[in-house]
Amino acid sequence: TGLKVSNPKQADITYLYEQLPKLHVDFYHATSKAEFRKAYRAAMEDTGKMGDLDFYFTLRRLASLAKDSHTSVGLTQELVAQLSAIPAQFSYVEGAWRVSVIERDHADLLGGEVIAINSIPMQEVERLASPLFSHDNQVWLRYYLSQQLNLTNLYAYLGIATSPSQMVSLTIKQRSTDEEHT
């Protein structure tokens, strides 16, 4: 690879970089070798200041360059224990991100359209998150994104929150009244 490996995270990134093209049937079908190498170099440079969850998202970004729906980096129990999430889940239904699970106190928002997270429109959130989720099409992107869209760690990694512990502001259009609530 030509880059010096000086810590365990760099060793893992290098392993992924070397093995993905060997183990994937056609890794470079939609990504050039130059693009993959550039992403690898960027990941290697960032490891010094990277926590475990940022490292996880960095590995996801590298693996997603396969640009298919079956190549990904999974979560370990140790990582799951470090995740922070808001008490809601979202699904892409009827052409919009909607609240699919929420606490009883906010049941009136169930099925409501999520307009923005921390004032960032959902279309922009989706665009920012897209490089972290290997996918062949928008259906797969939205499916995989829905599994992590309630994670404040994801918001922090994408830059739509300053930290995972930051209070999250959701803008939701209530389904029954069309009123927007933040």
Pin down the residues of each PLM region.
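Flexible, low-complexity junctional segments that flank or bridge functional domains
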Residues: 1-182
